[in-house]
Amino acid sequence: MVVSEITVAVGAVIEDDSGRILLVKHVPERGGFWQGKWICPGGGLELGEKIEEGIKREVMEETQLEIELTSPLLPFERIVKQKGKTTLHVIYIDYLAKLTGGKLKTGSDVCQAIWVGKKDLPQIWEELHEDTRKLLKTAKVI
């Protein structure tokens, strides 16, 4: 598959009152680039949607949690090529966020969600998606 569009993915590195970070895994049926790895909650920004609104919507859809965005993180991008053709071009726009409400419950496209202590993140390093590793380093939580 060759893509002709750039995806803008928005999300959050969410911390609870105990200093733990929220990670999710997508359902197997969804497939795709992030399948089978732990990632931070997020997804595609919709046309006409403000970045902050998109982040809060995606977090609510995937986890049923309410958050407060505290500070933006440096955006980064990923370009995936197969046989010389671009199959994915995504620009990540993420924020640090604090949990403010709700009860953790996975949405329809998420099969697992866990809170992980910052000191425990190295233990699941290989289970983190490579872009999530970069994001967590940018957020200075690892």
Predicted regions and their residues:
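Conserved N-terminal beta-strand and adjoining loop/helix that marks the start
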Residues: M1-L22, L96
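A generic structural micro-feature
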Residues: V2-I6, K37, K85-I91, V110
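Short, well-ordered beta-strand micro-motif
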Residues: I14, D94-K98, I114-G117
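Short, charged/polar surface micro-motifs in flexible loops or helix N-caps
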Residues: E15-R20, E29, E46, R78-I79, ...
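Conserved Nudix-box catalytic region and its N-terminal flanking loop in Nudix hydrolases
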Residues: R20-E61
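Nudix hydrolase/Nudix homology domain
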Residues: G31, K105-I142
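Structural detector for helix-capping/boundary residues
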Residues: G43, R57, T70, V116-K119
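Active-site segment of metal-dependent pyrophosphate-handling enzymes
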Residues: Q64-G101
